[in-house]
Amino acid sequence: ARVYNQKNINFIIADFRGYGFSNGTPTAKNTKSDAHPVLDYVLWHLKKENYIGPLILMGRSLGSVSVLELAQRYPNDFRGLIIESGFANEEPLFRLFGMTPEQVGFKIEDGFQNGAKISKYQGPLLVIHAQQDHIIPFSQGEELLNLCPSKKKKLVPIPNANHNNILGVNPQKYFEEVERFIHALNKG
């Protein structure tokens, strides 16, 4: 968050239940439903403080589920979307645990449906993905970009980075791209 503040970008971070400093048990349902009260609070707070800048949603990895849920539900409440290391479908998550969706009786309609949600998103989109991501393959970032019908979209590959060190490998490129995206939204 310090780097964002140095660039005059306000940033609010929310953990999932059971992650970071948050208690509770993480579930697929909570991943989607918990995003709504967080956005409600953010919108209330921004209104209270007379904030006039653009609101941009950003989700990292599993956070792509939350921001795409919000993008589908509240498309007029924010101006842009940043997805870092996100996924279009759940297949990489199953592979991570050494199984296939079929082995556990998983059906696409039971999943997060990130691909279906991004295929309806028309606003500005920035996708940042590590090229050597060992958890969510780079091809998932490409798929998110390709499924999105927006005319204002960009994929930023981070070479030599994996899922967990994407910020540390080339922070200059990472933050330049985020800053460029945000400033373009401020002008538009």
Label every model-predicted segment.
Residues 1-23:
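Conserved alpha/beta-hydrolase
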Residues 26-48, 116:
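Alpha/beta-hydrolase active-site loop
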Residues 48-61:
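Alpha/beta-hydrolase fold nucleophile elbow
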Residues 66-123:
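Hydrolase active-site cap/lid region
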Residues 114, 123, 137-146:
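Short alpha-helix in the alpha/beta-hydrolase fold that links the catalytic acid
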Residues 120-122, 127-129, 133:
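Short beta-strand/loop motif that positions the catalytic acidic residue
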Residues 132-136, 163-165:
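Acidic catalytic loop of the alpha/beta-hydrolase fold
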Residues 161-175:
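Catalytic histidine-centered segment of alpha/beta-hydrolase-like enzymes
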